[in-house]
Each structure stands twice: as C-alpha cells, then as structure tokens.
C-alpha cells in the first residue's frame, strides 16, 4: 500500500514537472514571437495574425491554469459527453497539458510564418480590422466604409477589451415576456433602466427570448398557457389569445426605447430555434413533442372546413366517417405511420400555417413600435435538409417573412451520438457538409438580396458533434465555404468561460471537448476571418455568383415522402463538384424572381406537388424556360390524386430515366449556353466519385479566381486548366502572395485559393 502511494506521488510529481516544463517552453516561445512582432512592425509588415496568436496563448494560459485546479469539475463535464464518458477523469487530468501542447504548436506555426514574412518567402496584404461602430447594411452585404466585411463573435463571450478586439464585438440585448410585470402591460423598471443605460454604439441584435413567462399569465390566461409549448424554447401556447396580448405589451413597452440603438442593426431575432412537433411515432419517443391546446384544435377545425367545405368531402379524402368537424380532435395527434396520407398533409400544412401566422403577428406588432425594424428567426435549416417529419417550420415562408436570413446552420466533424442520429456521410467525406451547403444555397435562393446571419453557428461543435483533437484545417474549411456560400455574420457556439477560465453555471453536455479547450481551433476561426476580410470583395463576388442550375424543391413532396430530401441531396451532390454555383427553385421563386437568373430547373424524386406548384412549372415552360426531369416526378397532387402531364411546346422539357442522365444533360445544356466556368478542375484519382468542391469567378477587373476545398477522406491530385485555351495556367496563392502549383495535391479539409492567369 505504501509503495502504491509513493508511486502515485511520483506520477503526480512527474506530471506536475512536465507541466511546468511546458509552461517554460510557452514563455520562451512567447518571447521569441513578441520579438518577431516587433521586427515585423519595423519592416511595416502586417503582424495582426501574430498578435492574435499571442493573445490566444495569453487567454488559454489562464484557462489551462484553471483546468489544473479544477480537475473534478472538468471530470463531471466530460462525463456528460457520450464519447468521453468512460475516460472522463483521464480527459480532465490531461486537459491542461493538452492545452499547453496546443499552444506550443500554435506558437511554432506563428513563429515560422513570421520568419517567412521577414525573409520574403511569403507575403501578406495589410489587414484592415472591421470597425464595429461603423457597420452598415447595403442590400446583401455588410459594409465598413466602401468595403464588404464579415463579422464573427461567440455566444456568451464576456465583454473585455482583449476578447472584443480579437474575437468579436457583437452587442446582444435580450428581451423576454418575463419582463412584462402585470396584465396592464407594464415593463419591469430594471428592464427599462437597462435599456436606457445601454450606450453601446456597436453592431448587434435584439434576442427575443420566448423561454420565460411571468407567473401572472397562468392566472390570467389559464395554467395551460404555460403547459402547451413549442419545445424547447417557446414556453407558452402561441394559439392562446393571451400570447398576443403578452407579446404586444412586451414590444409596446420596450421597442420604443430600443429603436434608435445601434445594437438593433442586425435586427430582432423573434425566437430561438422554433419548432412545434405534435406527431407521434408509435411507441418511439419524438424529441420535443408537445400536445396542442383546444385553441389549436379549434383553429384546425376552421382550417379544415375552409379547405374542404363539407365533412363529406373530408371523409372521402381521409377515409373516415366523422359526423362533423368538431370530431376532429379524436383523430389527433397524427402518427408518423400516416405520412403520405391526406390527413398527414392537412395537419402538417396547418401546423406550418399557424406558425407563419404567429410570426406575421409578431413582426406586425414590432413594426408598430419601430417601423424600420428588421426581423429574423434562428431557424435550424436541418429541418429542411433532413426533412424533419413535422416541426411546424416552413423555412421558405419564414425566410420570405424575414428581413435578414436568420439561421443556425451546422456542419459535422463527427457524430458522437450514432444511436440517435443516423448519418452515412463518413463513407465518402471527411465531414458532414449537407446542411452547410444546401442550407445556405436554399436561403440564398429564397432571398438573395438579404444578408445571412448565423446567430448560433454550429460549424465548430454541437450536441451531436465534438472532438477535442479537431483538426484546425476543418475550421478553415467550414468557415471559408460558409462565407463563399453567403454567410455575412456569425455568432459561434460557444464561449462559456469567464476571464479567469472559470465556467458559467449549469453547463450541459455542450462544453467538454469544445473550442474553449482548443487554442488552435479558436485561433484558426479568427485567422480565417482575417483572410476572408482581407479578400472581402473577392469573397462577396463568389457570394453573388449567378446560380444557373436550380433544383426544384416541393414542400408538398417533402411532407409526404420521408426520404424526399435524400433524393434532392443526390442531385445536389452530383453537381456540387462541377464548379457550378447551385440554387433552388420553388413555386414562389419561379413566380416572383427574374427567370433570367438561371438557365434550367432540375426536378427529381418529386412525385407529389400541389396544382399551384404544377402550374408554376407549366407556366415557366410555356414562357420558354427549360426543365430536366425524371420520369417519376409530378405524378399526383398532395392527396395522391393523379395529375396531367407537363406539356412542352418548344422542346424545352427533357424527361430522363436516371440521375446520371440528368447530370450529363444539365452540364451539356450549360455548355450550350456558354454558362460553364472558364476554369476546369480535374481530379486525378481512381475513385468513382469526386470530393473536391470548387467555384471560380471572373471579377469586374477580369481576374480569374478559384477556390477549392477537399471534402474527401484522402488527399487528391488536381489539375487546373482553361476550358477553351491551350495555354497552361499560372496560379498565385492569394493568401500568401506566392506562386502556386496548377497541379496541387490537396489534403482533406485543405483550402486552395488562387488567382489563375495565362502563362
């Protein structure tokens, strides 16, 4: 026993001495980098990245110190994460040294870059940091002076000069129904005081939290008011008349004081991650499922009566024998097994329409008190990309209602909950990109002239994805492509540490293994934003690329067919590695937008459409638009009743047998329209699928720019060439200002950003 105790003591001393050795190395390398920063300054070479590295290290030294003294607390937090549960104590014990080793790697990389700058091996454009006090919105761009800018911050990050300077200055003000003091609509004095004393002149947004309601509402509007919810973040019944009274009073009492504040510039976020799931799935658990109130059921009865006119018509469609519409309640909730039936369609459509109506009301009430207000919602686009069964969320309609394209788009480094979340992206790709790519392309297709604001970016981590050993190149890949696809501002999830490294209270499973324990990951996000802002005009040009191919999306087919979005992804995936900026078409996009914005619409896996969707496509054909379609689409309406066939009078409807035929036809069609890129990127591999996604543009000054990202699991040999020229291209690495190979080998996650010219 004594020998064992002695061994433990020696092990502890060994770890302690090793940790002290790491700290000495950090101090030494900090001194080296500080000296190099001074030399760069003297040579008038931009050194902002090196200062960022020094500040990142300074912050994480405090974090590592706190972690050394709080192993038990970190052990508890690691136990909350599925992949770390069994080795939580080991993870917590090793964390401080992991952070220190990561800081040393960051310092080594920064020292190497600084030396290369000093010797002229690489070059760097001067970085102009965005002035958060002077941000303006110009259509779909954030500008600082005459230059586009991209803004980035973190959820819950403390406001200090050091953190604000290097990690974002977004100003967030929260209002909530809990601030309505009584049924008269009076606002709590502390809320008014806080608004009046807020003198910030920085860009920000108002977070309208729906999570807390005052106790008096349960007496005034009934106990059920707080029991019927839109879980997990809307804690009251939106169909109870009291909801409108409560929110009207909140806006009436707060918005007149908020309306001239700079932090309303990025709008009022009307709710956090909205969803209203009511369906059942046999005996399986449906996440965040909630019953509905009699108010909702009564609305549904009226909705059905307006739609179907008579109970006989409803019975005929639903295959029921109801006596009158008031008997509808006994058929609710709908079950997932009923998907594809008229009953399922009616409920899910009604559920979306009542939610749209609710947000239309909130926007109208807000505008009464601030006519210039912009609104957005923190919608999870995974509801769209994963074809969520019934969330009450119509992403297109709610984006049309918004003035800013709100979202909390995610990417997936891994899947830490495979039993709960099915995914198969890792068979071909190094990270899950479906939501990231399709989400932004869908938003950009709906409202191309609005900014995209990801107010809770899950590109780094989330409840289903996390890895303490994350490759920092993943960070660059995801944030780089997100901005090329249209992202303008983001608030990344998340920064739960205080200045001394201590943690916020009541942390759940979202913390352990995330960015506040990863110095290089944290650095790389800001490092990427520096490059994006340095080349902001070029990145904005990529954002505004014309989208010549539009993939048709039918919310009708999505409701009625569980795997509908898998088919849509199959189309998207086929074309995402051909250098083409992709977009979507819907009934509304076809009817409301200039059809010159695209060349062809692809329709695949879309059996069910409404008559209005059918008519929109038929009119598009009649006006000379081109459609490529599979033979299984546009067969029946929302209720399964057969539709007539689309007609073509100008040989502009192409009905093909396979997805491969559709892909080849789409590319040949663009070739005939001279709509393919001037640059060609060829993958020199034996693989039967491509993994390098790329886009190229020609700027207003005639420069050819090319961006490539390797989404695959293996390195790829590429060849860059011109589509219509014999000459060999000359490539220049824009970020490092040096020549680049026209036959690069890209590792997984690697970003290749070059200017391409003739030799």
Task: Name these PLM-found stretches.
Residues 78, 86-131, 137, 274, ...:
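Carbohydrate-binding surfaces of carbohydrate-active enzymes
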Residues 4-14:
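Sec-dependent N-terminal signal peptides
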Residues 161-259, 361-369:
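Aromatic-lined substrate-binding rim segments of carbohydrate-active enzymes
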Residues 156-168, 250-253, 387-398, 471-479, ...:
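Short, acidic/polar
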Residues 230-436, 442:
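Polysaccharide-binding and catalytic clefts of secreted carbohydrate-active enzymes
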Residues 112-167:
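N-terminal carbohydrate-binding accessory modules
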Residues 20-106:
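Long, low-complexity or tandemly repetitive, helically biased scaffold regions used
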Residues 148-157, 173-184, 227-249, 289-290, ...:
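The substrate-binding groove and active-site-proximal loops of carbohydrate-active enzymes
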